[in-house]
């Protein structure tokens, strides 16, 4: 199993990245929370990873923190939630926010994540209750990288998460100007969940 990668970030195409580790390029899918906290291409990066082996593919998923990876592992154990859906959930909310939503049995909040309906949200509450613990969130392993046009990047991220253009643009209107992309995505997602 590949548990962690440390190397040079060589590609960033949401939600995929490529990390060069001693001449071998590892492609990994990452949550948008992790993606917008990555350093610029060409800089050193460390990711916690989860390798999923299927009959037709080997899929590598990357996470900024061990806690995010642990949450991903719990999510994919829930019936009806696959790896891509779990990554979408972790893009829509942090591991802490997810843990709080499960603890508070906030089905509405959970079902607002892309690909999650009311029944799946109820199943998440049932199967994850007591398994996720909210922690104080730190800034993670990376410094945020400023984007040239934050609003456009935030809208693009929301579109990648499955929201339509109208919803994405409406959510971005509530984000203060000058907000970095990672924080902007979090604020826009909160606007969508209201």
Swiss-Prot record:
Annotated segments matching region Domain II: 65-143
Spans annotated as Domain I: 1-64
Pfam families documented for this protein: HHH_5, RuvA_C, RuvA_N
Gene Ontology terms, MF aspect: ATP binding; four-way junction DNA binding; four-way junction helicase activity
Localization of this protein: Cytoplasm
GO annotation (BP), single: DNA repair
Primary location class: cytoplasm
Keywords per UniProt: Cytoplasm, DNA damage, DNA recombination, DNA repair, DNA-binding
Gene Ontology, cellular component aspect: cytoplasm; Holliday junction helicase complex; Holliday junction resolvase complex
Presence of keyword DNA repair: yes
Function in brief: The RuvA-RuvB-RuvC complex processes Holliday junction (HJ) DNA during genetic recombination and DNA repair, while the RuvA-RuvB complex plays an important role in the rescue of blocked DNA replication forks via replication fork reversal (RFR). RuvA specifically binds to HJ cruciform DNA, conferring on it an open structure. The RuvB hexamer acts as an ATP-dependent pump, pulling dsDNA into and through the RuvAB complex. HJ branch migration allows RuvC to scan DNA until it finds its consensus sequence, where it cleaves and resolves the cruciform DNA.
Domain notes for this protein: Has three domains with a flexible linker between the domains II and III and assumes an 'L' shape. Domain III is highly mobile and contacts RuvB.
Quaternary structure and partners: Homotetramer. Forms an RuvA(8)-RuvB(12)-Holliday junction (HJ) complex. HJ DNA is sandwiched between 2 RuvA tetramers; dsDNA enters through RuvA and exits via RuvB. An RuvB hexamer assembles on each DNA strand where it exits the tetramer. Each RuvB hexamer is contacted by two RuvA subunits (via domain III) on 2 adjacent RuvB subunits; this complex drives branch migration. In the full resolvosome a probable DNA-RuvA(4)-RuvB(12)-RuvC(2) complex forms which resolves the HJ.
Family annotation (NCBIfam families): ruvA (TIGR00084)
Protein name per Swiss-Prot or TrEMBL: Holliday junction branch migration complex subunit RuvA
